[in-house]
Amino acid sequence: IGPGGKASNQAISARKLGASTTLSTRLGNDNFNSYAHDIWRREKLFASTTIDKNLPTGMAGIFIDHKTGENSVIVDPGASAHLSIDDFYSQKSKMKKGDIFLTQFEQSSDTTFAVLKEARELGMITIFNPAPFGKISRKAYQFCEIITPNETEAEQLTNISLKGKRDVEKAINKIRDLGVEKVIITLGKKGAAFFDGENISFCPGNNFGKV
């Protein structure tokens, strides 16, 4: 068992790169709560947390195919599933135009929609990682400046099977039609594809061996 979660990992990475970073989350009243706070204190990351007395801290099991290196993740979001717009509002006074706001899909779709809308209306750069994938109002994508699905999530989002570059390009264009300005699709060992607002480009993957 180790620390993690997309939000925590990304917030710590941003902090290590020198960015002033705030992590807004909801945890259970358990040992993992203390464990998480110990890590964030060590990394000098400010975390705005709400403690849920009825639900545990979210957990994920990661299963790796040692032949291919591909992974599968089973998530129990626990308390984080109840993250709400009120948690966003508690930090709103610190947010300003040009700041970067990143969210994912471990909270409810209603909360995801609401926080993206609020952040975009504040003039923030909004990044949406649609994982674990779930359905959300089509209108929500209008408030995403950047979306970052992986290969599976892009297929679920577009109903296009990504068998080659042409399929990836079709998927990117379909996502753009939802109102998203920029698209990054991660493709595992094949690298990534991205649309920067003008052109679609492909970035090859590098094999760094076991990590």
Predicted region positions:
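Short gly/ser/thr-rich secondary-structure transition/capping motifs
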Residues: K44, A81-D86, T126-F133, G205
